[in-house]
Regions:
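N-terminal glycine-rich anion-binding loops that anchor highly charged ligand groups
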Residues: 1-36
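Glycine-/acidic-rich phosphate or pyrophosphate-binding loops and their flanking alpha/beta elements
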Residues: 2-6, 228-251, 264
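Thiamine diphosphate
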Residues: 29-123, 133-155
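Structural signature of the thiamine diphosphate
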Residues: 132-189, 342-352
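Conformationally flexible catalytic loops at phosphate/diphosphate-handling active centers
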Residues: 158-243
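Redox- and metal-dependent alpha/beta enzyme cores, enriched for Fe-S-associated oxidoreductases
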Residues: 241-276, 280, 286-292
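Peripheral docking tails and interdomain loops at the edges
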Residues: 307-352
Length: 352
């Protein structure tokens, strides 16, 4: 099935309570598949086409604020419209899930795939000092697997989590093993697992207030410090990455998502030409695997960062490597996906 279809099936199977979205290419199959599957008739999951992306993210705010596992999906221009809501969720510590099946920009741009929303996702695209947990799938299987993972991380840390995919992964078809079916949680289970949620106040506890607003500077600073401490805990415990053919590698290609899939073929071609190169694939774009990449760079002659953008993740790679090895970037723009041999040629330039 398509990556987008896998997202839809995974939403139902992981016990999600609600989906709020708005059609936009190249992710429209997600809400279309949910409409065909009619989960409201089986599990009771709500599926609603909102009037806009702004409405959709605020529906996620409300549903997640009540302790529900709710999700929204969109593509780059639509996710741009959601940034205020995502910032509000981070400030109020509300655990929703957002899926971005990226397309090229800026502006309305193109419907072709891109990875140009990396900065927006990993730096916090709205106002304020906050971070969103960002997972980058590189296969249809990971599209399915990362939905439940995103929910688990979001609720573990009371923080928004994003699956940052792109039009290649969303539209391509692969075999996939769907996750096991989990029942939706009961109201009693939600009350036990989410004591912070706004689900009605029993006499045994004070009122739960969920807001990002605080007008006393010293209190607001304390809240920000607490958020930063939480983000550091996430950095310390939730980094995920994958390495391939690194045992004898002199050079490294760093790539995520669909670019990593292309890089795998580039590495195969390069090794046939006698170039010993391996792949480092960040799975969490935030938190970024900077310590792991720092240690790896100590033993390598050079690093090529392959992206479908003008050079975004390469900045995090350079910060992580910190001058221990040369770092160069190769990317294509405007929705053009790089060919494996183009990456090999960029690698040869790095070697020279």
């Amino acid at each position: 099935m398509k990556g987008n279809e896998a997202i839809a099936h995974a939403c139902i199977r992981c016990g999600a309570d609600g989906f709020f979205g708005y059609p936009i290419t190249p992710q429209s199959e997600i809400i279309e598949t949910l409409a065909l599957l009619k989960p409201w008739e089986t599990s009771g999951m709500v599926v609603l086409q909102a009037e806009s992306e702004v409405a959709a993210i605020n529906m996620v705010y409300g549903g997640a604020g009540a302790g529900k596992r709710v999700i929204t999906t969109s593509s780059s221009p639509g996710v741009a419209l959601m940034q205020e809501g995502i910032s509000y969720m981070a400030g109020a510590e509300i655990p929703g899930v957002i899926v971005n099946v990226q397309r090229g920009g800026p502006g309305l741009g193109t419907i072709q795939p891109s990875q140009s929303d990396y900065f927006q996702a990993t730096r916090g695209g709205g106002n304020g000092d906050y971070n969103v947990i960002v997972l980058a799938p590189a296969s249809v299987q990971e599209m399915a697997d990362f939905v439940d993972l995103a929910f688990n991380l979001a609720f573990k840390y009371r923080n928004p989590a994003m699956i940052l995919s792109d039009g290649v992964i969303g539209q391509m078809m692969e075999k996939v093993v769907l996750p096991p079916v989990k029942p939706r949680r009961t109201e009693e289970e939600i009350a036990k697992e989410c004591p912070w949620a706004t689900i009605g106040r029993p006499k045994s506890r004070p009122v739960n207030i969920m807001t990002s607003l605080e007008l006393k500077p010293e209190v607001m600073e304390a809240r920000n410090i607490a958020l930063q401490e939480k983000y550091q805990k996430i950095r310390d415990t939730e980094v995920r990455y994958e390495m391939e053919q690194m045992e004898d590698a002199d050079y490294v290609i760093v790539a995520f998502g669909s670019a990593a899939r292309i890089a795998e073929k580039s590495i195969e071609n390069a090794r046939e030409q006698g170039i010993k190169v391996g792949l480092f694939r960040p799975i969490t774009l935030w938190p970024f695997p900077e310590k792991e990449l720092h240690e790896l760079a100590k033993t390598k002659k050079g690093i090529l960062v392959a992206e479908i953008n003008a050079g975004q993740m390469v900045q995090d790679v350079r910060l992580a490597v910190n001058g221990q090895a040369p770092v160069e970037h190769f990317g294509r723009l405007g929705g053009i996906v790089p060919e494996p041999e183009e990456i090999v040629e960029a690698l040869k330039k790095l070697i020279k």
